Amino acid sequence: MEVFQAFLSGIPLLQIVGDVDHFTAPALEEAAREALALDRGCLLFDLSAVPYLDSAGAGVFLTLDSQMAPGFWVGAIGANANLLRIFEIVGLGSRPSFRIFARTEDACAVLSDTDS
């Protein structure tokens, strides 16, 4: 797995490439904590190049979601059907602090609305 940091409308965007599993989840969690330290109100993940996510990977998202300050949120962009199913199973899909976007443009639209 590789993690690349970019910004989308001033919000940290972690682009993940590869499987997120027991071996790679700690690196993802570290990158996410560094991005959260920027204190921008939310954190986005581009998951379009993530074919597989196991329970350790889901745990990273659960931990982040549970630690978000009120009004802050985590966004997942481009997750495949398997990842979306995992997010539903672990309960992330129904949490207001965890948002799922099909495309980057959808996340941009929400960020634009937030800025207004």
Predicted regions and their residues:
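STAS-typified acidic loop motif
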Residues: 1-30, 49
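Non-catalytic signal-transmission and effector/linker regions of two-component phosphorelay proteins
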Residues: 1-5, 106, 112-116
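Generic detector of low-complexity/intrinsically disordered segments
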Residues: 15-16, 46, 94, 113
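Amphipathic alpha-helical interaction surfaces in cytosolic regulatory modules
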Residues: 22-97
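Short acidic-hydrophobic, aromatic-tinged amphipathic segments that line or gate anion-handling sites
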Residues: 97-107
